[in-house]
């Protein structure tokens, strides 16, 4: 039996989403429920996949099935396609299995020709309606199917309205519209070299192909990447009998939700327009009326709609987004789907549906997407204000939140103005660790270069600052202190605004509203926590970040980067002395200055954690990052004075630190191998801090010491011996011992494939997936943004491997290391501390491979908690 590629609505059901797409499955389900659905058929997602496999051709067997389904639908309608007296017209719409509103294409009124439009005008005794439908169809078909610029058609309409002195398209007469149709067909012939097609079957097949093609249009590709929708799913095509909302004042069209999608309030929410077609509502040319007014204008239709809406929500057990048309007083349902909603509404609806007895706690947890929580935790722009603000540029949405401030081009300037309580946006080509203070005092960060895991992105997320990175449209002149975007020049102190959730950069100031976490949030997250197995820690380097993360539900620190503490203004001089020292004695003298500062940092962190665990990563970055640039004369002179050498000698030493490839150079555990005294100082700081806080507060602290960038067992054994020897001395001096653990970051591919050997020394593994991704692909994460766009365009990649874990490659190394490590040490604790720890799909993977915890930026902690709950619930359900 031939494979079935086309299903009539009556042949499908809601469980066939993968085959029929969301729209097709729901149209089938509404048909089965006996609702007034204009009939039609769905061409499956498998037909779309085959269309691409066959070289963008629809196979003859699929064409035959489409024509057979068309004949069945004609019988139901009692009309014929292309008939000159009573023509059968259809809409052609996309429908992927995941909702992608507005991303793909729609064509209405298909089947109209020069002959059938006359029949439609005579049949309805309404030539205005018939020619209005025809001009809409020609414009849509030309735009969507043939890619003729739609502004050419809009210009003709504007010309006619101006000539006739009217405001709206509907105010043009039937004779005007006949002339518009002639002009539209002329535009089509000018572009295509042939007349507008007059065979409805040709129109239909071209439209189906266009919907398949639209699966790969730029906005659909971007939307898929943003929402983790696989590119090989394809879209279905729904061919549906047309019903008309533009047949006079007893006709109309609208969109409604069973609950308020902004607040979650249990109240019908929606709009409609009389004498209009669907796109009129969306286009916003006319102001729609609230659906409550329909009760006055058409009480019977309104009551029927309320009954259907109630039935649909009860059936789908979720808030529904419905499209409907009223044709001459008769209601038709064109679509239902689970409605898109704000994060606040999602929480309220989930909690309310549990209270109403509709959902279990676990089912409710699955109703909220983890990424949605982002917007709850950061300040947001006022919705009305942001609509009016001009967008001047767009970059990568690296760290969510809304920020408005004056622009400054150096971290020092940003910090200076920030300390004066001014609102600041730090604008840089790219940020470096030295910019940390300026970033801290900024509301937002904007960079020309860098990707989603660049320094600016990672640090901004950790701080909860809005950040837009990789905004290539910007031109920065640091000397003149100007930012040029297009032909507009901004000077230091001029105001711009950033939306870190969308990547938009706006001109001027936009009012913001603080994020408010509702009681529903705490209750909902309690249900999520009860369901998950995976623990969630945070990446934090300051007590403030730690407290914020604990407030968001972090169960400890999975990554405390000690180098961030070294950049503080009061200690960078001592750090530089240590780096540029010639002898061990000089180095130890400088380290003695740093020790009390580092110990004080750890004490503050342990107190903020209140007994929760903390993994401290020893010094990791290349040393050149800590020293001043050779052209920073004041800093060089001061350093020379402190070291008792000349400025020229300091410059010589700085130049000697230069490396061709610093990310694979003298960093990580290699620093401890060459300078053991650094590891000694850090061990003292960690253990003495733990002892002091244990004595003072009574917490049961078990320090976790993590050695970075280990590639072999011997490397780890060498550094671990320094830790153990120093620990012995500290315990003797303090007259007290503590349990502590030494582990390593798995971030070099060799460490992953020899994990069984490394586990002989390591008591825990933490996967540093930022570096592991970088080294596995051979990509520099700070430069990958220059070519990843081409990889997306050419379908080599569907998502950024630095933002979403590459489970096929990097993930296999994680899986291998986990398995090998536990063969050696069955109780080996496993975590992940790269930025992937806050990505929902990556958290899902971590659950599957049996990790103990994920660690992420403080503002991503709730997202990881919810993603971990999703993973556990879906596993339980066998999905």
Segments (PLM) and residue ranges:
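Extended, non-globular alpha-helical segments
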Residues: 394-434, 485-523
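Glycine-rich phosphate/ribose-binding loops and adjacent secondary-structure elements
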Residues: 330-332, 432-440, 444-446, 452-458, ...
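Short beta->alpha connector loops at strand-helix junctions that form conserved
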Residues: 41, 448-450, 469-472, 560, ...
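Structural motif
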Residues: 238, 408, 425-427, 446, ...
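Flexible inter-domain linker/hinge segments
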Residues: 208, 215, 377-405, 409, ...
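Conserved alpha/beta-domain cores
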Residues: 93-94, 517-519, 527-879
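Nucleotide/phosphate-binding sheet-loop regions of phosphoryl- and nucleotidyl-transfer enzymes
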Residues: 1-389, 415-418, 422-425, 432-434, ...
């Amino acid at each position: 039996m031939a494979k079935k590629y086309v299903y009539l609505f009556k042949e499908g059901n809601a469980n066939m989403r993968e085959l029929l797409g969301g729209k097709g499955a729901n149209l089938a389900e509404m048909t089965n429920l006996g609702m007034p659905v204009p009939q039609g058929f769905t061409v499956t997602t498998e037909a779309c996949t085959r269309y691409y496999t066959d070289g963008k051709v629809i196979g003859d067997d699929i064409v035959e099935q489409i024509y057979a389904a068309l004949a069945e639908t004609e019988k139901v309608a009692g009309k014929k396609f292309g008939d000159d007296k009573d023509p059968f017209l259809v809409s052609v719409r996309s429908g992927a299995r995941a909702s992608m509103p507005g991303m793909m294409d729609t064509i209405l009124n298909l089947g109209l020709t020069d002959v059938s439009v006359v029949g439609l005008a005579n049949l309805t005794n309404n030539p205005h309606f018939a020619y209005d439908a025809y001009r809409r169809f020609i414009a849509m078909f030309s735009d969507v199917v043939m890619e003729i610029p739609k502004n050419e058609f809009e210009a003709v309409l504007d010309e006619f309205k101006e000539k006739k002195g009217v405001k709206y398209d509907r105010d043009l007469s039937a004779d005007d519209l006949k002339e518009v149709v002639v002009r539209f067909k002329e535009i089509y012939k000018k572009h295509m070299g042939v007349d507008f097609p007059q065979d409805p079957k040709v129109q239909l097949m071209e439209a189906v192909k266009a919907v398949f093609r639209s699966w790969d249009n730029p906005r659909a590709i971007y939307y898929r990447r943003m929402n983790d929708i696989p590119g090989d799913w394809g879209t279905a095509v729904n061919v549906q009998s047309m019903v008309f909302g533009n047949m006079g004042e007893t006709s109309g069209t609208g969109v409604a939700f069973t609950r308020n999608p902004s607040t979650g309030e249990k109240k019908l929410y929606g709009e409609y327009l009389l004498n209009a077609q669907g796109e009129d509502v969306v286009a916003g040319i006319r102001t729609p009326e609230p659906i409550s007014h329909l009760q006055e204008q058409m009480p019977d239709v309104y009551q029927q709609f309320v009954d259907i809406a109630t039935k649909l929500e009860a059936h789908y057990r979720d808030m529904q987004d419905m499209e409907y048309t009223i044709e001459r007083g008769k209601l038709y349902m064109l679509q239902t789907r689970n409605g898109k909603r704000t994060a606040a509404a999602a929480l309220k609806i989930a909690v309310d549906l549990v209270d109403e007895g509709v959902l279990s706690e676990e089912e409710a947890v699955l109703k909220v997407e983890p990424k949605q929580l982002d917007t709850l935790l950061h300040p947001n722009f006022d919705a009305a204000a942001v609509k009016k603000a001009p967008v001047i540029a767009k970059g990568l949405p690296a760290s969510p939140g809304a920020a408005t401030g004056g622009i400054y081009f150096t971290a020092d300037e940003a910090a200076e103005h920030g300390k004066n309580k001014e609102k600041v946006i730090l604008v840089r080509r790219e940020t470096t660790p030295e910019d940390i203070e300026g970033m801290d005092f900024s509301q937002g960060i904007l960079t020309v270069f860098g990707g989603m895991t660049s320094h600016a992105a990672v640090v901004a997320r950790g701080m909860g600052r809005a950040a837009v990175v990789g905004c290539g449209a910007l031109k920065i002149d640091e000397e003149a202190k100007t930012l040029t975007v297009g032909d507009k020049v901004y000077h230091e102190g001029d105001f711009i605004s950033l939306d870190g959730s969308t990547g938009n950069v706006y001109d001027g100031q936009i009012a913001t509203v603080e994020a408010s976490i509702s009681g529903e949030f705490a209750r909902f997250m309690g249900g999520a926590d009860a369901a998950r197995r995976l623990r969630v820690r945070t990446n934090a380097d300051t007590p403030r970040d730690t407290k914020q993360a604990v407030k968001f539900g972090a169960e400890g620190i999975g990554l405390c980067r000690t180098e961030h503490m070294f950049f503080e203004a009061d200690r960078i001089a001592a750090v530089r002395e240590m780096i540029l020292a010639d002898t061990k004695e000089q180095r130890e003298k400088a380290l003695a200055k740093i020790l009390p500062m580092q110990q004080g940092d750890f004490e503050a962190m342990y107190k903020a954690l209140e007994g929760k665990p903390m993994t401290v990563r020893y010094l990791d970055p290349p040393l050149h990052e800590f020293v001043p640039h050779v052209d920073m004369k004041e800093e060089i002179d001061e350093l020379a004075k402190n070291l008792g050498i000349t400025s020229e000698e300091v410059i010589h030493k700085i130049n000697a630190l230069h490396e061709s490839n610093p990310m694979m150079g003298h960093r990580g555990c290699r620093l401890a191998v060459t300078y053991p005294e650094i590891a000694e100082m850090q061990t003292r700081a960690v253990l003495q801090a733990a002892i002091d806080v244990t004595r003072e507060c009574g917490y049961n602290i078990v320090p976790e010491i993590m050695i970075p960038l280990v590639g072999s067992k011997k490397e780890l054994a060498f550094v671990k011996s320094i830790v153990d020897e120093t620990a012995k001395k500290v315990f003797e001096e303090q007259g007290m011992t503590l349990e502590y653990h030494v582990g390593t970051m798995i971030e070099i591919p060799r460490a992953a494939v020899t994990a069984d050997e490394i586990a002989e020394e390591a008591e825990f593994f933490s996967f540093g997936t930022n570096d592991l991704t970088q080294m596995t692909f051979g990509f520099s994460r700070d430069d990958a943004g220059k070519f990843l766009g081409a990889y997306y365009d050419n379908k080599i990649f569907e998502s950024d491997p630095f933002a979403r874990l590459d489970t096929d490659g990097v993930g296999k190394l994680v899986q291998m290391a986990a398995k090998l490590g536990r063969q050696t040490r069955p109780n080996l604790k496993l975590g992940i501390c790269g930025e992937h720890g806050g990505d929902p799909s990556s958290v899902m993977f971590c659950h599957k491979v049996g990790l103990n915890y994920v660690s992420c930026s403080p503002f991503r902690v709730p997202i990881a908690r919810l993603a971990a709950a999703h993973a556990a619930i879906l596993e339980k359900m066998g999905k």
